[in-house]
Design a protein with these regions (language model features):
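An acidic/histidine-cluster motif and surrounding catalytic segment
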Residues: 1-106, 116-148
């Protein structure tokens, strides 16, 4: 069973329960469930803006950031990394995009997990592969396609 730590560093927003976050993470891990450790941190806009500037060199807030763990050569570890999700942005995007809050939370948490697993969306073929997998994973939990 994966070790999934959920940290709440934000208040006042409708936030998912730790059990829901763990379920979404486990579902996105697929076959890597047994040996994995990761952290999901829910933050406010100030913390996310600071992280986005510091680690991506981009000003402003974003919805989710993933920080993969990169072990030293020869070191084997189940540590996958950290996912940081900005709760106010998730809530605002869900309303603007006409999605349920749970569906959008599930999507962004699983999106973060896929980044930790090595997926990216910087080039069209990679984006298509990642978005297709996200859609399949969400459908497996009863959520609609987030891209349609």
């Amino acid at each position: 069973m994966p070790s999934i730590e959920v940290q709440y560093a934000v208040a006042g927003e409708p936030l998912p329960l730790p059990g829901d976050i763990r379920r979404w993470v486990s579902h996105a891990l697929q076959d890597r469930r047994d040996d994995v450790e990761l952290v999901v941190r829910l933050v406010d806009e100030a913390e996310m803006t600071a992280l986005n500037q510091r680690y991506r060199g981009k000003s402003g807030v974003t919805n989710v950031l993933s920080f993969p763990y990169e072990p030293l050569p020869g070191i084997s570890s189940g540590l996958l990394g950290d996912i940081v999700v900005c709760a106010p942005v998730v809530a605002e995007e869900a309303v603007r995009q006409g999605k349920s809050l749970d569906a959008h939370w599930a999507h962004l948490v699983m999106h973060g997990v896929l980044h930790l697993r090595g997926y990216d969306h910087h080039h069209d073929p990679d984006a298509y592969r990642m978005e297709t997998l996200e859609t399949e994973l969400l459908a497996g939990l009863g959520f609609a396609d987030p891209y349609n």
